[in-house]
Amino acid sequence: MSVWNKGFTKETHPALRKTSETMRRKRIDNFRDWRDGMKRRGLIKSSYPSLAKNGDLAELLGIVLGDGHVHKHDRCDSLRIVGDAQKMGFVVRSAQLVYSIFGKHPKVTKRKSSNGVNITFYEKNIAKRLNIPTGARAQYEYCLPAWIEKNRSNTIRFLRGLYEAEGSLSHSPATYTHKFIFSNTNPHLLELVARLVRGLGFTVSNSANKIQVSRKDEVQKLSNLIEFRHYES
């Protein structure tokens, strides 16, 4: 016996969409009893407290600001970080940070059409607890929390997250040049990163969509300080 609505969703079938809209308008929740039972069994959270303010959270915030996205759904939020299949150290570390902070493993999937790897996590109030808005952030002016800015260790972890997501380290033997670059199209985020790196004692130059540390001794020192691309085997 075939199922008439197999393969359809409320977005792709008019009858399903109408039913969904009617249930939403009448505030009918088909899954309430199931959800309440799962909460009683401890399989679904019933509360979503503030996140522990520590180095792991500081680093994850940097990753999300650099290469992450928070999306608002009807009943929850989703956090997605995009990594590279050729840089699995970043993927594994990002997934571990999500688990460390939220206590739940994210879904890690390879994109079929590219080397991209999605690290995806669903839960209520992600945006509120991270204090990062949902949607696009091209011009978003992030207000760095005091628990990061006034703590050197947390500042370093925050910068590590940003550089792991959007940083590049290069050395040209031909020209004897060294470059440690952070790239981003958000001018407010670039200025924040430049200010924090200068505050740690490094010389920074600014240009379109990137900031750069280029003194040989400083490049290696900054790379070592934030443990750039250093992953546990």
Region spans (language model):
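Internal intein/HINT superfamily modules and their associated LAGLIDADG
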Residues: M1-S233
